[in-house]
Amino acid sequence: MREIINKLNPIIIDKADKKFGVSRILKKYDGKPVYIKDVNGFEVVGNLCSRETLSKIFNVKKEDFIFFMLDAMEKEKEGKLKINNKLKEKYIVEIPENIKNWPIPIYYEKDAGAYITSGVVVVYDKDYGYNLSIHRILVKDDYLVIRMVEQRHLHFLYNKALKEKGYLDVAIVIGVHPAVLLAGSTSADITFDELKFAAALLGGEIGVFELDNGLLVPEAEFIIEGKILPEVDDEGPFVDITGTYDIVRKQPIIKIEKLYRKEKPIFHALLPGGIEHKTLMGMPQEPRILKGVRNTVPTVKNIVLTEGGCCWLHAVVQIEKRTEGDGKNAILAAFASHPSLKHVIVVDDDINIFDINDVEYAIATRVQGDKDIVIISGAKGSSLDPSSDLKNKLTAKVGVDATMSLIKGREHFERAKIPDK
C-alpha cells in the first residue's frame, strides 16, 4: 500500500476527524490521491482510484485500460494463488469490540453511522469457488450490517449457505492492491474466480494466506473475519453513486469473530459518490459492454462510462462505421450488455470519447433528432437512478446515433486540420 501511495504523490494532510472530516477532505480533492497522517491515531488514504491513477499504477494508457482488463479477464483461469501463511505473522489480532477504534468514517450528514466502503468481501463455495465483491458495510457496536443486492452472486451464495449450514463464512479485506478492488468490482459469470482475475491483473500471481475460518485472502491493511448470519437489521440511509441517499432496508448481520491489522496500517476511505466510487463501479463494466457490442458491431473501437453519468448510467461507444444502421445496432447492443444504462451515445472513430466536448461536437454536427435518436420506454433500469420508477425498476432509455451519415459521405463532415510543418 505504501509503495502505491508514494507512486501517486498524494496531497498530504496532517489530521482529520473520522466524522465528516475525512469526507470533507476527500470531497475537496475529489479525483486526487490524498494521504492523511492522523485519523483517530491511524493513517488514512483516499481517492486512490481514478482513470489517471489506475493508468499510472498499472502502467497502461488510459484509453487502453479497457483492453488491459479484457485481456486479464480472458486469462483468469491462468491466474495463480501463491499461498504464503507467513504473511499472517504481519498482523495484530484484536477483539471484535476494537472495531470502534478503527478510523472508519461517517461520510454524510444523514448516514446511518460509520461505513466501511472500500472493503472487499471474500467468500468461498465448494461448488462455485471464490467470490470477491464490494459492498457498503455499516458498523453497529460489535457487529456489522451488509448491503447485499438481491440476485447478485453474494446474495445467491449467502442463501445457498444458509440452507446448507445456517451462515456464510466471510472475510472483509480493507487496504488492498487496486487489482483486488477492480476484481471485486467486476461483473462476470458466477464461476469466474475474482482472486485469479486479480492475479492476472498483477501479471499472473497474487500472494494469499489462510485465515482461521479457512478462507484465503490477499494481503491487506485491515481484515475482518466473521460470519454472515440469517438475522437482519436496519441498513441505511446511505449515499450511493449518484450522490443521493438510498433507502433504509433490512439487511444481513455480520458477526465479527476476529479482527486483524498491521502494526502501522493505512485505512482506505472511499468517498461515496466520489470519482473513486464511480471509477470502481464503472471501469470493470466496460470490457463486458465492449464484448457485447463487438458481437453485433465488430468494428467497435472503444467504450467509456462517463463520470457525468456516474460511470454507470451513460456510455459513449466509439465505432468505425461501415454501414448505415451500425450506430443504432451498437446502441441496442450496449443496452443489452449493461441493463443499468440509461443513455448511450455512439460516435465515429475520429471522436475522442474521453473528451466530453468532442462528444458534444458529434451530437451538434452529426445528429438529426427525428432520425438519429432511439427512445425505449418501460425498460428495466437501474435502482440507482432517482428519476426512474423505483418500485418496478423501470426507466426510459435514450440512444443517440452521433455518427456521420454514409449517404452524405464522410467528406461532408471532414474536420479541418493544420499541417505539423
From Swiss-Prot:
Note whether Metal-binding occurs among the keywords: yes
Source species taxonomy: Archaea, Methanobacteriati, Methanobacteriota, Methanomada group, Methanococci
What this protein is called in its record is Anhydromevalonate phosphate decarboxylase
GO cellular-component term (any):
cytoplasm
Give the species: Methanocaldococcus jannaschii (strain ATCC 43067 / DSM 2661 / JAL-1 / JCM 10045 / NBRC 100440)
The Swiss-Prot or TrEMBL record lists the needed cofactor(s) as: prenylated FMN; Mn(2+)
Pfam family name, one: UbiD
Q: What family, per the record? A: Belongs to the UbiD family.
GO MF assignments: carboxy-lyase activity; metal ion binding
Please explain the role this protein plays, according to its UniProt record: Catalyzes the conversion of trans-anhydromevalonate 5-phosphate (tAHMP) into isopentenyl phosphate. Involved in the archaeal mevalonate (MVA) pathway, which provides fundamental precursors for isoprenoid biosynthesis, such as isopentenyl diphosphate (IPP) and dimethylallyl diphosphate (DMAPP).
Instruction: Give the EC number(s) listed in the UniProt record.
Output: 4.1.1.126
What keywords does the record list, in alphabetical order? Decarboxylase, Flavoprotein, FMN, Isoprene biosynthesis, Lyase, Manganese, Metal-binding
